[in-house]
Amino acid sequence: MSHVRRFDHVGLTVADLDVVTAFFVALGLEVEGRTFVEGEFLDTVCGIPGSRTEIVMLKPPGEGTRLELSSFVRPDSVPGSPAAMANELGLRNVAFEVNDLQAAVDWAATEGYGLVGGIGEYEGAWRMAYVRGPEWIIVSLAERIG
């Protein structure tokens, strides 16, 4: 018996909600909603009494897994490891299939977000690159080529 019904979302905690939201909206995601959450529910689920967070839920075009961005109002966020590379344990990247990888990489560069490495090709099927986005988030961009 499977306990999972579907993959709902991935959550990222960020410091500057507006900057990170703008990046993902410019990439092609849509804002589904924005709200503050606090009280017993958040305290219980997060295990942080007295917490308050602002959340933006983003959705991809069509259907698919959503991206939840959360910025804590209280308590203050705890810094992560901004220079984390792909081999560091934990959540390392958020991945999106794009129509034109080079155009997406060029756009990211004009916004000040460079490649982690380079553009690679996998078995004639995919071209992919990691971009270091706002707040050092690694964003995987992949184009199906075969």
Residue ranges of model-derived segments:
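N-terminal beta-strand motif that seeds the catalytic metal site of vicinal oxygen chelate
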Residues: 1-21, 27-33, 90-96, 142-146
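A short acidic/small-residue loop/turn micro-motif
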Residues: 39, 74, 145-146
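A cross-kingdom feature marking solvent-exposed beta-strand/loop segments within repeated
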Residues: 39-44, 77-81, 117-118, 122
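Core segments of cupin and vicinal oxygen chelate
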Residues: 13-64, 103-104, 110, 129-132
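Helix-adjacent hinge/juxtasegments
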Residues: 66-69
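Short, small/polar residue-rich loop motifs at catalytic or cofactor-binding pockets
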Residues: 124-126
